[in-house]
A protein has these predicted regions:
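Flavin (primarily FAD) cofactor-binding/catalytic cores of flavoenzymes
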Residues: 1-35, 39-40, 87-365, 377, ...
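N-terminal FAD cofactor-binding segment of flavoenzymes
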Residues: 20-78, 219-221
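Low-complexity, highly charged intrinsically disordered N-terminal segments
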Residues: 76-82, 90
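Acidic, metal-dependent phosphodiester-chemistry machinery of nucleic-acid enzymes
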Residues: 372
Length: 520
């Protein structure tokens, strides 16, 4: 039997896609999972067990769509029992709750998963994938949802002498009265430092890149406040430090480690420092070793991710797709495809892309009257409750297409996919399209949000909307394959964009002008 779709990995992304395929019921599919449980990654990681994906059951709203803005852990489902907020009220949950949630999700959705089926090889013969996992499975399409499953190790002589994040001890008493170097400046490094501050005599964090704060960049993979206690101990002269520079070499003797640094911001070219322990917390990468030469995907970003098209397909292997954290290659350190609260929507979009491409199924759309009022009302209603555009800012869009008197509203379309492929159907050859996104201002990550001397535009002021730095709706009018006009809705402290004179009336006027061909 040749499957329509074979999914490798039963983590959050693999389960999300499987649940969509199961509910749709039109495709033969199977999920292969090497472990005995779904979501096995979370049984080990993060090592210190606290997730940094927020969980807020108490939102003041009974709208499940709106509430997903503050629920970063749930997968998409119509079953209210499968909301992660039912599992714990902790704002930063324990990873064991995620393991339990994913097991329940797999069981209650009835997805087809083969556990204990670790994939050892993938090849492609005459256009069909052959996947070896004890036995051989054949599939027309393969979706890789394995996550970043191998440690990313920088090229440092002697790095093999150090301890890895994956298997280092996490009991702080194991580091009592020791000097510790942590290589890395991401959340895993700071999470580790935070855990060891009470028992070590000194901790240094080292890396060539600047520490970037998530509250400034709006990228949730940058350093989160929940992990940044270490910064206090550094800047308040409490024994610890951050070393900005490159580790040149690591050696080890009976008394510990000697580490050679080349500093980025100091006068000395190199310096040697002594440590009792060296821990490597430099993140993870995609493991492409299972693919043979017939279908080995091209890699990108220091070979950490597969290179992908706007359809999350391998750039060099047709019909090989990716789902989950691997898809952050398309918006690396810019949006949220590296995280559940982002890629759950990307997986739903991928399912629609696959059905459109292989099943000749149009993107779901609601018909509207082709008037400024009708289109603006639909846009206003959506931007005030959508979680997808909220979480996947500047990456996913709602798209309203207009062909004469026929307007259609399409939800959650990848911006790059629409730009390249469009949404035309045999009965809807549109001339105009309105692409609706939520976006920050172009230099939002250059502004200190806590600096009261920084001038900001006033909220709810129509004439200043285009200068807004904070998240706000943007509507772009496309005609003839290019953007011909842009309209910004004024930012608002409560993220409500529905004031008649501030948001609604200007948007109606913009759409009407565009439909008349007058532009912006």
């Amino acid at each position: 039997m040749t499957l329509d779709c074979l999914i490798i990995g039963a983590g959050p992304a693999g389960l999300q896609l499987a649940a969509l395929l199961e509910a749709d019921g039109r495709r033969d599919y199977l999920v292969l999972e090497g472990a005995d449980i779904p979501g096995a990654f979370f049984a080990t990681y993060p090592r210190h067990r606290q997730l940094i994906s927020i969980n807020k059951p108490h939102t003041g709203s009974d709208d499940p769509e709106f509430n997903l803005r503050l629920d970063w852990n749930s997968l998409l489902t119509d079953d209210p029992a499968l909301r992660f907020t039912r599992y714990t009220e902790r704002y930063f949950p324990d990873a064991d709750q995620m393991v339990r949630y994913l097991a329940d999700f797999a069981a209650k959705t009835g997805v087809k998963v083969r556990y204990g089926a670790r994939v050892t090889s993938v090849s492609k013969v005459d256009g069909i994938f052959e996947v070896r996992a004890g036995e051989t499975f054949r599939a027309r399409r393969v979706v890789v949802a394995t996550g970043v499953s191998r440690p990313y190790l920088p090229d440092i002589p002697g790095l093999e002498l150090a301890e890895q994040y994956a298997d280092m001890p996490v009991d702080p008493r194991d580091y009592l009265d020791q000097k510790v170097l942590i290589i890395g400046k991401g959340n895993s490094a700071f999470e580790t430092a935070d855990n060891l501050m009470e028992t070590t005599t000194l901790i240094h964090l080292a890396g060539p890149s600047s520490v970037r704060m998530a509250w400034r960049t709006h990228y949730v993979g940058h350093l989160r406040a929940v992990n940044n206690n270490f910064l206090d101990t550094y800047q308040l002269k409490s024994a610890n430090a951050i070393l900005d520079g490159t580790v040149r070499r690591i050696t080890r003797d009976a008394d510990g480690y000697t580490v050679t640094f080349a500093f980025s911001r100091a006068d000395e070219v190199t310096k040697e420092l002594r440590y009792d322990r060296v821990l490597v917390c430099t993140g993870f990468a995609f493991d492409a070793s299972i693919f043979d030469g017939s279908c080995r995907p091209e890699l990108a970003i220091r070979d950490r991710f597969p290179a992908q098209t706007a359809q999350w397909e391998s750039v060099n292997v047709p019909d090989l797709f990716f789902a989950g954290t691997l898809t952050q290659q398309r918006d690396f350190k810019r949006s949220t495809n590296g995280f559940i609260h982002g890629f759950r929507y990307a997986v739903r979009a991928l399912h629609r892309i696959l059905e459109r491409r292989y099943g000749d199924t149009a993107w779901p759309a609601e018909k509207l009257d082709a008037t400024g009022t009708s289109i603006a009302d639909a846009v206003i209603a959506r931007v005030n409750r959508t979680s997808a555009l909220w979480q996947q800012f500047d990456v996913l869009a709602d798209v309203v297409t207009v062909a004469d008197a026929d307007a259609r509203y399409h939800e959650e379309v990848p911006v790059d996919y629409f730009t390249e492929t469009g949404l035309r159907t045999a009965d809807h050859d549109y001339s105009d399209a309105f692409v609706v996104t939520l976006e920050y201002g172009p230099e939002h990550d250059q502004v200190d949000p806590f600096d009261v001397t920084v001038k900001r535009v006033a909220q709810d002021v129509v004439g200043q909307a285009h200068d807004a730095a904070y998240l706000h709706p943007v509507v772009r009018h496309h005609r003839g394959g290019r953007v011909v006009a842009t309209h910004h809705l004024a930012e608002n402290l409560e993220n409500r964009w529905d004031r008649p004179q501030v948001h609604v009336t200007p948007l109606v006027a913009f759409v009407d002008r565009c439909l008349r061909g007058a532009g912006d």
